[in-house]
Curated annotation (Swiss-Prot):
Pfam families: Ribosomal_L1. The keyword Manganese does not apply. PROSITE patterns: RIBOSOMAL_L1 (PS01199). The gene is rplA. It comes from Streptococcus pneumoniae (strain CGSP14). Part of the 50S ribosomal subunit. GO terms for cellular component: large ribosomal subunit. Binds directly to 23S rRNA. The L1 stalk is quite mobile in the ribosome, and is involved in E site tRNA release. This is Large ribosomal subunit protein uL1. Gene3D superfamilies: 3.30.190.20, 3.40.50.790.
Length: 229
């Protein structure tokens, strides 16, 4: 604990809490000040000036990072017949119907992404209390309720991330690992930022991005200058 506190203090000394950095500077600092003994995740956190109580200001979606996330997702697909075979051919880790529902209800959760064809949603709906709180419930907005299961599986395996604004307008997302080259992290960030800008609600007023930070697992939040984007 003492060693970790010392490392945290050392990291804090390198970061000026009164300054907002460029994306390139923030990424470099995030890599430099990371003291985790594992390949830490690099995350971005936005605070958006939106009112999610209004239906037209709710933000939710998915996108594929150009350089991936550095993590191989375990993909589960609810499908039958030809679509089940399509999912298997695309590399899905688990494919099934009622058998998977029973397994999940028994406590099995060794997967990261759930995809379903539309006709399977009545079945998947039985798992709402299990999948919903874990943000695993398939949803058309994130491309996880689809007939194109091959594409959905390939994207999930290839760096697809989902995002959603919480009640306070906060949006968090993974943009890679500390082991990534800085340029690749910057590219991933810029791709995600472009997505966030594109989904800005037409009815949102004032400054859209009010705060933005980049951090690593167990690391220190580094403020990004939103005016530099």
């Amino acid at each position: 604990m003492a060693k970790k506190s010392k490392q945290l203090r050392a990291a804090l000394e390198k970061i000026d809490s009164t300054k907002a950095y460029s994306v390139e500077e923030a990424v470099a600092l995030a890599k430099e000040t990371n003291f985790a003994k594992f390949d830490a995740t690099v995350e971005v956190a936005y605070n958006l000036n939106i009112d999610v109580k209004k239906a037209d200001q709710q933000i939710r979606g998915a996108m594929v990072l150009p350089n991936g996330t550095g993590k191989t997702s375990r993909v589960l697909v609810f499908a039958r017949g030809a679509k089940a075979e399509e999912a298997k051919a695309a590399g899905a880790d688990f494919v099934g119907e009622d058998d998977l529902v029973a397994k999940i209800n028994d406590g099995w959760l060794d997967f990261d992404v759930v995809i379903a064809t539309p006709d399977m949603m009545a079945l998947v709906g039985r798992l709402g209390r299990v999948l919903g709180p874990r943000n695993l419930m398939p949803n058309p907005k994130t491309g996880t309720v689809t007939m194109d299961v091959a594409k959905a599986v390939e994207e999930s395996k290839g760096g697809k991330i989902t995002y959603r604004a919480d009640r306070a307008g906060n949006v968090q997302a993974i943009i890679g690992k500390v082991s990534f080259e800085a340029e690749k992290l910057v590219e991933n960030f810029k791709a995600f930022n472009e997505t966030i800008q594109k989904v800005k609600p037409a009815t949102a007023k004032g400054t859209y991005v009010t705060n933005l930070t980049i951090t690593t697992t167990q690391g220190v939040g580094i403020k990004v200058d939103v005016n530099s984007l």
